[in-house]
Amino acid sequence: MEFVGIDIGNYKTVIASSKENGKVYGDEQGKRSIRTVMELSTPVRRFGNGVTNDVEQSLDLRSRSFRDALEDKKGWGNLAMFMKYIDRVVKKNTPTHPPICMAVPAYFKERERRILVDIANTMDFKLEGLITDISAIAMFACVRRENMPSEFLLFDFGFSKTTAGLFSFEKNVLKPLYMKTVRVGSMQFDEKLIDIIVEKHSLEKSRLVREKIKRNLDKIKTTLNSTKCCNIQLFITENPLEVIITQEEYRNAVKSYLSDLDSFVSSVIKETEFNGLVEVVGGNSISFLIKEMLRDKVEYQVTLDVSDSTAIGAALGMACMSLRTRYSLHDIVGREISIRIQGEDVSPTVIFKSTELVEGNPKIVTYNRKESFVLEILEDGEVISTLNVVKGETKETKAIHVSFSIGKFGTVCVNSVECEESVDYEYKPFRISDIDLDDIKALEMKYRDGELGLERIGTMRNELETMAVGLGDALYNKFGKITNDEELNTVREVAMDLFDMPQSETVGQEEEVRNTILSKLEFISKKLSDYRDAAVEDLKKHKDMINEFRKEYGSVFTPSFYKLQGLLYKVDEYLKDFDLNLFNVKLFDESFIMEIKGDIQKYLEKAKLEIEEKRKEEERKSKKENAQEGTSSKPESKEESEAKEDNDEESDVASIDE
């Protein structure tokens, strides 16, 4: 069984399969990493690596960072469209429609997780689980590396954040012990690098200029990672721009962010009390600035893939959680979940600590109440949902047992509310309203219907042009007997007219173009139809010849008779699908008809000869048998009769024994 892991980061998205111990799926261009960007251009949207044209008009249609832009409806719609694009990439790579596990940041809480699940369900995105990204990386490490220590620390220096995770790995069971995140990554470094270039060369402080510089940042950073000075030519304006940046300039520009990361790493080491070899991953980990910062703080190694680890780990993690495998993964809640009765001035009761397991044992809380009440569910001290427990008022208090659990998506679930008397309850977690979900679905359909229509228009025009271009030569080579030069010239003129017609904007317009071209070629269609009718009639006559032969000689079986049976089947199969029109005339092969007609004639004659030969053989055999019977019934001579009598007399005496 296959599982797919998806890491939708703020910079890039990676799709991986659990096949082959972790295999990355490429996009329509075959690239392993898909840029997390979308452009709502018309008539066709652009996604990922297809977003290439940096012009002012397209920038206003461009969106990024879908994962972390879930605070409003616009962000929901953008994420939904990008998820649907990712779903199409998955389906292009595998026909099995496998379950999907998505990696999410450690700071994703109840609201973000539920938004993600609601959008996935609306988009028919087969999301079956969420896993914290640092846990996915740890899973990847355990599966790919031998002799993993029983406890290890990971640092993921990513694009928009930096995450640390401490894990235990005993008896092939992986469990997170500690997680921490700071919202600082290479994104902030990149913005400062762009600022240096803009200010140093007095460039226009526009979004377009920043986008053009952004496309060259990888080259600049790669150079700075190996040399103290980068000298590069950028094409930002009409004239090429010579850009010179030093490591020192870059270091000073990101000084405050480096300080934040330095403090973050120090706090993680102090809080975990870890003193072993640290594993470092993430795209920002290759920066000379990060290497300098880590050099005097920890002993570390970089042995995992800096880009694909999260997606592969998510796929492998879901496989390990769903199947009986050698490895087992337990993710943790990552935040504190508590409850309290609404309106009561009491401290909340903690039911799930941050280090408790997702899909772990449920927690049952008992309340002794006489009447209905409302429970507030809190996440790190903030109310995220309510549970309205409705019971009839009684004189005596009754025990009401409420069962809570953390589901596969890391969200709080109410399993049951039980009481010895009748009780009802309504759980009200955060969810996107049905109206908003319908709007999200309608937004995707609006764009997708137009794109599919455009694809259909392109397919229709391509089919029409292919037919028109090749029709003249096909008629000349295969149907020269039923067409003349004037007709062939007309066909070629129609093809030229087609290429002068503008591209249609709607399917209806393209259908009008198609009907116009076909009407001009109606005289050819009539000739082809007449030819087909004549060929069908001719083949049916040959069928009748075989059937008449079978009626006359049905009881006589010869090799050629069996061959005729096979030819009859061939003709029937050919006639089932035999069609001749403008679009398949190039594929028509008259030789089959000529060969099968010739074979029928040949084997009819051979069958007649074989039957005649069989008849003569039977006559010869009959004469021979008659001759043998005549010899055995011939009258005995007088001498033979007397001799026989003498023998009979002798035999009467010879049979006596002593």
Curated annotation (Swiss-Prot):
The annotated regions of Basic and acidic residues compositional bias extend over 614-627
GO terms in the biological process aspect are: endoplasmic reticulum unfolded protein response
- Give start-end positions of Acidic residues composition bias: 642-658
InterPro entries the record matches: ATPase_NBD, Hsp_70_fam
Identify the keywords attached in UniProt to this record, alphabetized.
ATP-binding, Calmodulin-binding, Chaperone, Cytoplasm, Nucleotide-binding, Stress response
Tell whether Zinc is among the UniProt keywords: no
Keyword Cytoplasm tagged: yes
Care to name a GO molecular-function term for this sequence? Answer: calmodulin binding
Which cell locations does it reside in?
A: Cytoplasm
Under Pfam families, the record lists: HSP70 (PF00012)
Superkingdom in the source lineage: Eukaryota
Annotated region described as Disordered, given as residue ranges: 614-658
Gene Ontology cellular-component terms listed: endoplasmic reticulum chaperone complex
Q: What family classification does the UniProt entry report for this protein?
A: Belongs to the heat shock protein 70 family.
What the protein does comes down to: Required for normal growth at various temperatures.
The protein's name in its UniProt record: Heat shock protein homolog SSE1
Species of provenance = Encephalitozoon cuniculi (strain GB-M1)
Protein encoded by which gene: SSE1
